């Protein structure tokens, strides 16, 4: 396929046009008085949103060279979203500012490699300065404050802080669509997996159709149980304790299932059987998680263990297990806190190395179940359009809150970026590297400038006053007042701010050092069919 190639200034300018188109579309959403962008959807109603990464992903330009520039900025937004979960609009604004200033200097004859070196050095200094002034976030009120700022809703902030308090900072908090108009929080405590009882005759509450097991033993195996003789010695030992038994196995069938059901109906002992969760290697990992949580051992041939040889020592235990037709919940497993902590660390290390989004999602689910529960924020709204917009806002708020807990917070509204300018300005560089440093200094002003502009104020005036104010004092664009940003609750997670700056500097440096751009040449349009010709005459039979 033929290619179009552009070189030097022509190549960079084409890409920068794409950068500007995307950034100008996204940056109108920045700040408390940012506007919305309406996105056409192929199916269903249009999406109204102020989420930077969602907007960036939708933009596709007709010109291939411009589109490459737009896609690079979209990549900045996506990368920032992946790392910090928020700050995508800030990252886009910073990228545009660095690229625009950098291009002026490269066009004037500066060396792009030297400029890039200066940009990298200045960015590193700014990030270190941000980390140095970060304040830790702890406690329900502080977490609620962070979430409220990001979601622009105190109610959502309260839901997120309560969810994190209930399931822990590592716990899974999912966001689902509610059937009603109200947004509500639902928490499932303990480890839950999506497997229910194998027979309805195993229930203990016929009205609710659930089986409640108090202080049960738990048999965990990846084997199929077809012959009752395989587990008979173990059943006899459990029977002596008068405690219920939960069996988690690949399957229970043959004579084994009716035998267990018959003994349950007769009242001989209380037993519930469920299928093991997951499939393949993930099933083995989840069974091991359950074993660690409950203090048991997985009966598996991989460890050279047979069901007929299993002893009471291999059984796990829990304070309570609830099983319905679809789910099993294990509450307060008897596993040691050290073993659980080690297992959590193992899963976290796997999370850091995995490249698959699906694997990442499943690992996070496993982590949450071990950490103590799953919280579900059910989003309600009057219309589907409002529901989609609110769901995106809550997702951003949740991600920002987690980032704040992880690395701390700084003054929001772009104030922290202005406050670290002195550290960057003090960086001793010369030549084109010094030019790169100055480009970053100018870019650090841009988020404040855009927030002010979106709120109807003159950005330059706000920036001048901000530079002469004490550290932490900033401009509240929502009210037009000068306030102590952190005390007022206008904050940004350090992770969000530094990720936005690092990713923006990285991609902007790449664009400035681009010397050639190769794009697919558009295919010429097919010649129009002469009018009046019958399509059936063109060789078709």
From Swiss-Prot:
Its EC number is 5.6.1.7. GO terms for molecular function: ATP binding; ATP-dependent protein folding chaperone; isomerase activity; unfolded protein binding. It catalyses: ATP + H2O + a folded polypeptide = ADP + phosphate + an unfolded polypeptide. The keyword Coiled coil does not apply. Belongs to the chaperonin (HSP60) family. Signal peptide: none annotated. ATP binds at residues 29-32, 86-90, 413, 476-478, 492. Forms a cylinder of 14 subunits composed of two heptameric rings stacked back-to-back. Interacts with the co-chaperonin GroES. The keyword Manganese does not apply. It comes from the Bacteria. It is found in: Cytoplasm. Keywords: ATP-binding, Chaperone, Cytoplasm, Isomerase, Nucleotide-binding. This is Chaperonin GroEL. NCBIfam families: GroEL, PRK00013.1, PRK12849.1, PRK12850.1, PRK12851.1. GO terms for biological process: protein refolding.
């Amino acid at each position: 396929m033929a290619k179009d190639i552009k070189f030097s200034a022509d190549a960079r300018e084409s890409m920068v046009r794409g950068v500007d188109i995307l950034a100008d579309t996204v940056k109108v959403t920045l700040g408390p008085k940012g506007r919305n962008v309406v996105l056409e959807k192929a199916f269903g109603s249009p999406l109204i949103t102020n989420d930077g990464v969602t907007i960036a992903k939708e933009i596709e330009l007709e010109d291939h060279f411009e589109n490459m520039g737009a896609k690079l900025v979209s990549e900045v937004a996506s990368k920032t979203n992946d790392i910090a979960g928020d700050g995508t609009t800030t990252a886009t604004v910073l990228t545009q500012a660095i690229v625009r200033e950098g291009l002026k200097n490269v066009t004037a004859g500066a060396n792009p490699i030297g400029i890039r070196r200066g940009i990298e050095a200045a960015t590193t200094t700014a990030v270190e300065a941000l980390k140095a002034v970060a304040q830790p976030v702890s406690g329900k009120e502080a977490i609620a404050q962070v979430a409220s700022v990001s979601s622009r809703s105190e109610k959502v902030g309260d839901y997120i802080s309560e969810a994190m308090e209930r399931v822990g900072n590592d716990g899974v908090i999912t966001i689902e669509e509610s059937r009603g108009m109200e947004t509500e929080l639902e928490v499932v405590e303990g480890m839950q997996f999506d497997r229910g009882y194998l027979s309805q005759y195993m229930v203990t509450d016929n009205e609710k159709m659930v089986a409640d097991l108090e202080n049960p033993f738990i048999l965990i195996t990846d084997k199929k149980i077809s012959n009752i003789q395989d587990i008979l010695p173990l059943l006899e030992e459990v029977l002596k304790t008068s405690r219920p038994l939960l069996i988690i196995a690949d399957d229970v069938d043959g004579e084994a299932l009716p035998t267990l059901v018959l003994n349950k109906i007769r009242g001989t002992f209380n037993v519930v059987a469920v299928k093991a969760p997951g499939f393949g290697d993930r099933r083995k990992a989840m069974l091991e998680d359950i074993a660690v949580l409950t203090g048991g051992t997985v009966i598996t041939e991989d460890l050279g263990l047979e069901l007929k040889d299993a002893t009471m020592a291999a059984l796990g235990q829990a304070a309570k297990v609830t099983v319905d037709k679809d789910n099993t919940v294990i509450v307060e497993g008897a596993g040691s806190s050290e073993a659980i902590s080690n297992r959590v660390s193992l899963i976290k290390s796997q999370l850091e190395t995995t490249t698959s989004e699906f694997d990442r999602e499943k690992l996070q689910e496993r982590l949450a179940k071990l950490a103590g529960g799953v919280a579900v924020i059910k989003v309600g709204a009057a219309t589907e359009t409002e529901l989609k917009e609110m769901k995106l806002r809550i997702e951003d708020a949740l991600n920002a809150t987690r980032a704040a807990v992880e690395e701390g917070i700084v003054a929001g509204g772009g104030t922290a970026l202005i406050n670290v300018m002195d550290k960057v300005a003090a960086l001793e560089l010369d030549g084109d590297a010094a030019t790169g440093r100055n480009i970053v200094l100018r870019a650090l002003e841009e988020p404040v400038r855009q927030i002010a502009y979106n709120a109807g104020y003159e950005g330059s005036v706000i920036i001048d006053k901000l530079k002469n104010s004490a550290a932490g004092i900033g401009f509240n664009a929502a009210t037009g007042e000068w306030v102590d940003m952190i005390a007022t609750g206008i904050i940004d997670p350090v992770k969000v701010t530094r990720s936005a700056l690092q990713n923006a500097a990285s991609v902007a440096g790449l664009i400035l050092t681009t010397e050639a751009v190769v794009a697919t040449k558009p295919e010429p349009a097919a010649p129009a069919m002469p009018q009046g010709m019958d399509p059936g005459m063109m060789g078709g039979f």
